[in-house]
A protein has these predicted regions:
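Long, terminal "pre-/pro-" and other extracytoplasmic accessory regions
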Residues: 1-101
Length: 101
């Protein structure tokens, strides 16, 4: 039996963190919200991803939340619910004069 002697990370790169979070966002929240960057925090061993609301016709309107992923396990360790992100996105869109998300 082979024994794993080199630790493996579930989410080793920023690109993989962004891909995972965007898949969740687009499935649960909608296509207008996305993550474009992920920053690694070595103290918590988590990826931090700001969630932005953007429209092709208006560009990026702003950040509506943050997601935290544990790099070793791949688990979401902090995120607003899908319903909360939708509420925040609708509020920001309305404040910018855009109807609906």
């Amino acid at each position: 039996m082979d024994v794993l002697t080199v630790p493996q990370l579930a989410i080793p790169t920023a690109h993989e963190a962004v891909t995972l979070v965007n898949a969740w966002l687009h499935r649960e929240v909608g296509m207008a919200v996305h993550a474009t960057t992920a920053h690694f925090d070595s103290t918590t061993f988590c990826w931090h991803l700001p969630i932005e609301l953007a429209y092709a016709t208006h560009g990026t309107l702003g950040v509506v939340g943050d997601v935290y992923l544990h790099a070793a396990t791949g688990a979401f360790v902090g995120r607003p619910s899908a319903a909360e992100l939708i509420r925040r996105a609708e509020h920001l869109a309305a404040a910018c004069g855009i109807d609906g998300c």
